[in-house]
């Protein structure tokens, strides 16, 4: 368990190298990070980790649900979670329509991804994000 105010972020990305890179960068910034390789795994992780504050998801993934559908479902089931869509295929408008707070276009610099996580964490603290909830090792 982290210190009070520390944010827990779930990274959903089907490509192992990208997922591991994002997890490492976010951990270096002080986030507690969980990881999933697809939407089904992400929903399972969320059901077991109510401390999750932030969802950061890719859009194109194998399985029955893409990242936009995942964000929409999480917005319904866990409206307190702040979501960020990371994609080279979807638009910021599509992300907002699904209920996401933030959007990061691929390809991205890692500092851009980290800044999006910090922005979401700040929104949680200020209750600006419409989908909010004020240490678990990542699973790959």
Indicate where each model-derived feature is located.
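Two-component/phosphorelay signaling modules centered on CheY-like receiver
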Residues: 16-34
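Hydrophobic/aromatic residues positioned on beta-strands within the core alpha/beta folds
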Residues: 83-86
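Active-site residues of response regulator receiver
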Residues: 58-59
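Acidic catalytic/metal-coordinating carboxylates
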Residues: 38, 63-69
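A Lys-centered signature of the CheY-like receiver
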Residues: 106
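Non-catalytic signal-transmission and effector/linker regions of two-component phosphorelay proteins
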Residues: 1-10, 16, 111-140
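Short, glycine/charged-rich "phosphate-handling" switch motifs in NTP-dependent
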Residues: 101
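Acidic, metal-coordinating helix/loop segments flanking the phosphotransfer/catalytic sites
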Residues: 35-54
């Amino acid at each position: 368990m982290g210190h009070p105010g520390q944010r827990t972020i779930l990274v959903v990305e089907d490509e192992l190298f990208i997922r591991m890179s994002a997890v490492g960068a976010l951990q270096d910034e002080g986030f507690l990070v969980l990881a999933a390789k697809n939407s089904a795994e992400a929903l399972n992780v969320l059901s077991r980790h109510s401390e999750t504050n932030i969802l950061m998801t890719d859009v194109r993934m194998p399985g029955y649900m893409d990242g936009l559908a995942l964000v929409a479902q999480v917005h319904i089931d866990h409206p307190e979670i702040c979501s960020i869509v990371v994609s080279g295929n979807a638009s910021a408008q599509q992300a907002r329509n699904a209920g996401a707070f933030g959007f990061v276009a691929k390809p991205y610099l890692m500092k851009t991804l980290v800044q999006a996580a910090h922005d979401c964490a700040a929104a949680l603290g200020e209750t600006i994000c419409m989908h909010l909830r004020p240490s678990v090792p990542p699973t790959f």
